[in-house]
Structures are given as C-alpha cells and as structure tokens.
Amino acid sequence: QRASQDMYNTEAACAIYRNFLDWLFATFEADEATWRKAMAARLRVTPGQKVLVTGCGLGDDIPAILELVGPEGEVHAQDLSPAMTIEAASRWAQDRPEQARQISFSTGNALRLPFADHVFDAAFHFGGINLFDDVGQGMAEMNRVVRPGGRVVVSDEGVGPWLKDTDFGRMVVTNNRLWGLEAPIRKLPATAADVVLGWVLGNCFWVIEFTVSDATPRLNPHVPHKGRRGGTMWTRHRGLLEAVTPEMREKVERAAARAGTSVHDWLESALAKRLEQTQDGER
C-alpha cells in the first residue's frame, strides 16, 4: 500500500482529497450525502450493529452508516494514512461530540487488520482498494473479520467494460488511469455468497457486494446424469482415465447402447470385471 501512503499521508493530503471528492460528485451530478446513504444501505445493517470501514479517508461514509446502526451501534474506521485518521477524528470530536463515542479511528494496514475473526456485522470500503498491494488479501481480511451472514461492500474506480472502447470510456481513463481497471471479481474469497457486481457514478466505479459465508456453495455432486453418457458430476471431475482412440470410444458407445446402459455404467462394469479377473490371476 505504499502508493496510498505516499499519496495521502502529507500535510496537504486532506485538502487535496476533499477537493477531489467535490470535483467527483459535481462531475457526475450526484448529491454526495444522498449517494453515500444509498451505498451504506447495501450493507443491510440494523440498529445496534458494528461496522468496519477500511480506507476511511476523512470519514465521509460514517454519517450514513451511523444513521443505520443508531445510537447503540459502532463504527470502526481504519486508514493507512495518519493524516487522514487524525483529521477525521478531530472533525468528529469537534462537530459531533455526542456521536464521537460510537466511532473508533485507527491507523494501520488493511491487509493485516488487528481484529479477531467474525467481530463485525458488516464491512465497507470505497475508493482506495485499487492501490492496495494485494487486492485479494484486502478482500480476504474484510471477509475474515465479518461474521457469517454479514455483508461486505467494496467500491473503487473502474469504468464498465461495455464503455471502455467508447469515446466516453477513453475520455475518463485518460483523465484518471485507475478508471481503466477491471472490477476484481476474481479476487473474492471462494466462500463469498449472494454476490452482486454493479457500477455507479456514471458507470465509472464498480461495486462488489457479497455475504460472508463459512463454506463454498452447497451441491450434491453424486446425482446421476440420465442419458447416454451417465455418470455424475463427481465422476466426470475426479474419475477421468487415460485417453483412448476414437475407434475404441465408438466401440464402447455401441456396446453400451446394445446393453441399454450409459457409457459410464458400461465402463464401470467392464473395468470391474477386468480387475476381478486380474486379481484372480494374481492369486
């Protein structure tokens, strides 16, 4: 995350970042407060719950999240930049002291979060993960600290792929090369459930949402296929043997058809008989 640290941990970083946000929402003709409320709603949190915000910047997403978790809820806001977290904490203490007790600010690396497993009800990130040294690890850490059933919402620059080869797409990528990046959907943990991929702000920012789960999708791989080939998902995946000639394959298919069975069942039977004969000979 050296790129993020170099960019945002300077005396002028807070003003530069706020200037960028003002430009961003003006450019896409979006009301920032309304937009952030809509993004926070994707977390599906309820009053009294605990939310983690990684890459919190100046804490601009916190008001919308606090509105959802209510006076008994908590927000833990993390950023790599000390300048950002100090400024954000100072603003909350000065402007909203009655709510500041609900917020914990910390400076640290989002790739190694200092939290136990499953301690949050949801996790949120907007506008920084593209610069992480390891995007997949950033996703994995949010997944780790959120309880099963909790929601993770992550968003950053990346124009929709259907726009990349248009004049619009070339214009926005020329303005900011990060908008040329792909949504890192392949970086999700294998256990991610209820996954949603979309785009916001002129389709120039991708949004990935998923529910934390403790297992990969459920299925029964042993249900037999009906028809000529037969077998199951499991046998087709794990039971492949050495290749045979096309002529031998045709002979097997014809033999299975004459026997009124699937190719899988015919092969299982033929191989079992052959192995039995071999074992008898060895005795």
Protein language model annotation of sequence segments:
Residues 101, 241-244, 252, 256-272:
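Short amphipathic alpha-helical segments
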Residues 220-247, 256, 265:
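Short Lys/Arg-rich basic patches
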Residues 50-112:
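Class I SAM-dependent methyltransferase SAM/SAH-binding core
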Residues 136-148:
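A short glycine-rich, Lys/Arg-flanked "PGG" loop and its adjoining helix->strand segment in the class I
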Residues 1-45, 60-64, 94-95, 151-176:
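Conserved class I S-adenosyl-L-methionine
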Residues 111-122:
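A short acidic, Gly/Pro-enriched loop at the edge of an enzyme's catalytic core
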Residues 175-192:
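Short alpha-helix
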